Amino acid sequence: MSKEIPTPYMWSYQPQMGLAAGAAQDYSTRINYMSAGPHMISRVNGIRAHRNRILLEQAAITTTPRNNLNPRSWPAALVYQESPAPTTVVLPRDAQAEVQMTNSGAQLAGGFRHRVRSPGQGITHLTIRGRGIQLNDESVSSSLGLRPDGTFQIGGAGRPSFTPRQAILTLQTSSSEPRSGGIGTLQFIEEFVPSVYFNPFSGPPGHYPDQFIPNFDAVKDSADGYD
């Protein structure tokens, strides 16, 4: 009975390539029942068989069906596209420029701004011109002037997504093309559930997975010393 209940193969992760670096049986998880009686041995075998059933069910749920157990390059459609954490930027505030925007009715799109040098002076003044138009708003406001706090709504309608007192801009980056190749640690845990391999040494040697051989090389995708 105990020989028919295999010890699962635990997969290891190759972080540089994002691949599985092979699997080995973890005999440290086996319960020592050498001095136990038949009743205890039967209970231990029942626990081991139940564990293997759980692993088989988990593999059926989380593992992606594929011909190659450990592909060298995962297609983008099968790779988790992890979004990087957003970046928070503190916006600079220029009280003098905001007052000039309000007084001049600055326009967000169109118009222009230029610097005027006063005759006989070396000081450059910032001049902003516009018509005080708020862009793309479904509701018509009674006042067409810009807000005195310098907060503008460029697109959409309704209330802006930030407050004047919260001068913080959150940026979310994303890649222009989906990533392919190796997989991350989270996907590795789901894809490479501990393997339950029944009767591993009953068939021809060529049918035994290379990944289960101790000297398997993940870089060469082969086991050293084996053809």
From Swiss-Prot:
The modification Phosphoserine is found at residues 118, 174. The modification Phosphothreonine is found at residue 64. GO terms for molecular function: hexon binding. The record marks 111-112, 157-158 as: Cleavage. Cleaved by the viral protease during virion maturation. May cause the middle segment to be shed from the capsid. Induction: Expressed in the late phase of the viral replicative cycle. Residues 112-157 form a propeptide. Interacts with the peripentonal hexons as well as the hexons in the facets. Part of a complex composed of the core-capsid bridging protein, the endosome lysis protein VI and the hexon-linking protein VIII; these interactions bridge the virus core to the capsid. HAMAP family: ADV_CAP8 (MF_04049). All late proteins expressed from the major late promoter are produced by alternative splicing and alternative polyadenylation of the same gene giving rise to non-overlapping ORFs. A leader sequence is present in the N-terminus of all these mRNAs and is recognized by the viral shutoff protein to provide expression although conventional translation via ribosome scanning from the cap has been shut off in the host cell. Belongs to the adenoviridae hexon-linking protein family. This is Pre-hexon-linking protein VIII. It comes from Human adenovirus C serotype 5 (HAdV-5). The gene is L4.
